[in-house]
UniProtKB/Swiss-Prot annotation:
GO biological process: ERAD pathway; postsynaptic neurotransmitter receptor internalization
Lineage of the species this protein comes from: Eukaryota, Metazoa, Chordata, Craniata, Vertebrata
Keywords, in A-Z order: Cell membrane, Cytoplasm, Cytoskeleton, Endosome, Membrane, Nucleus, Phosphoprotein, Postsynaptic cell membrane, Synapse, Transmembrane, Transmembrane helix
Protein encoded by which gene: Tmub1
Pfam families on file: ubiquitin
Organism encoding this protein: Rattus norvegicus (Rat)
Protein name per UniProt: Transmembrane and ubiquitin-like domain-containing protein 1
Disordered: region residues: 34-100
Stored SUPFAM superfamilies: Ubiquitin-like
Biased composition (Polar residues): 34-51
Amino acid sequence: MALIEGVGDEVTVLFSVLACLLVLALAWVSTHTTESTDPLPQSSGTTTPAQPSEAMTAIDSIREEAPGAESPSLRHRGPSAQPEPEAGVTASTPPDSPQEPLLLRLKFLNDSEQVARAWPQDTIGSLKRTQFPGREQQVRLIYQGQLLGDDTQTLGSLHLPPNCVLHCHVSTRVGPPHPPCPPGSEPGPSGLEIGSLLLPLLLLLLLLLWYCQIQYRPFFPLTATLGLAGFTLLLSLLAFAMYRP
């Protein structure tokens, strides 16, 4: 039996839930508006500015009563507060100071020298490209008997002193672009060539289809037989084009 005659129970429950939600929404809106219209923050904000004004009037009255006693304290505070910005300026100057360039003496086998200017963040490769453009692959740099072979290493990581000597060896022939293979190893194929195996697989599949067509002729209508013949002709032409001498 329905709660209300002529109206289903589902409709009654739905309207009841909507009514409850409406009541809750109205209650929340009423509490929100009352909190936003609370006059307490305004009164606290108006009372706080009164304190500095009272303090200023008290200071002015003290100055009027004893002007001679206040002036020494002001003179004493002025110079003590002045060196603070100077300390900040001196503390901020070291990060802004630029790094000094490195002066390098490049000494060749014939005892001739060449002065190069570089920065600590420059790499060995950039130094070669700058001083020997187009011949950086032929140049070898040696420092204190150690070959500087890593072109990505920076000059700052070597801790080079100013006006240090780097021995340069310039070879007459360009080195191979790829490292040579170790003895006893021969370069083999890079991988399995799938293209060379595709045609034999297709031929094997074609032979299997022709075998099924001969053994099970009723399952192959005329259209399937003609398609198989055309596929055979196309594959034969492809094989002839690939393996033609």
